[in-house]
Regions:
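Charged, low-complexity intrinsically disordered regions
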Residues: 1-185
């Protein structure tokens, strides 16, 4: 989404989807740090956050031989493909290099799933599939920190949020992988 010169990573995990598709994920923070001098010679630093959240990469066995990008609505100026769901179009834009494969993979079930997770997470996310690699970015900020509050009790809201993030990554990756495996490419 833009140039960055500050990169930080935390909470790295290396897991398998369905026991066979490797997923690497971590909490990522990318920032653009710019230093400049004003007319009086004072140095000022401006830090702009480019991305803060979870980034996941999943290697799949089958290639779609194209690229599909799903982003927040308005990013692609309505994308280059119109989907069959007006509700989906309210939340997302889709840009792709093969409209037929994109329509086969983004079924009504997948679109409904993406809409529901967008509402549950309360944060935007992006999905990029390039050939046999799927990338997922969740713009959720800093996560997976201690869930004990000042009263030494488990913060149920935070635990639920963390569960929803993991559930999204697991559910959507499994569904898209299933559709890819079942699609004639």
């Amino acid at each position: 989404d833009g140039y960055y010169n500050g990169y930080y990573s935390d909470d790295y995990a290396d897991v398998y989807i369905n026991g066979q598709y490797p997923m690497k994920m971590a909490e990522i923070l990318t920032q653009r740090v710019e230093t400049h001098r004003d007319s009086k010679g004072h140095t000022h630093t401006t830090t702009t956050t480019i991305f803060s959240g979870i980034f996941a990469k999943i290697n799949m066995k089958k290639s779609i031989n194209c690229q599909i990008r799903i982003k927040e609505d308005g990013v692609f100026y309505n994308g280059n493909i119109n989907m069959d769901s007006t509700q989906f179009e309210k939340y997302f834009d889709v840009d792709c290099s093969d409209k037929v494969i994109t329509m086969q993979l983004l079924t009504h079930d997948v679109m409904d799933m993406l809409i529901n997770f967008r509402k549950i997470l309360g944060a935007p996310f992006d999905i990029l599939i390039v050939n046999n690699v799927m990338y997922i970015r969740l713009h959720v900020g800093k996560v997976f920190e201690s869930v004990i509050n000042k009263y030494l009790a488990v913060d149920v809201g935070t635990v639920k949020r963390y569960y929803n993030i993991i559930d999204f990554l697991d559910t959507i990756s499994k569904e898209l992988i299933k559709n890819i495996e079942n699609t004639e490419i």
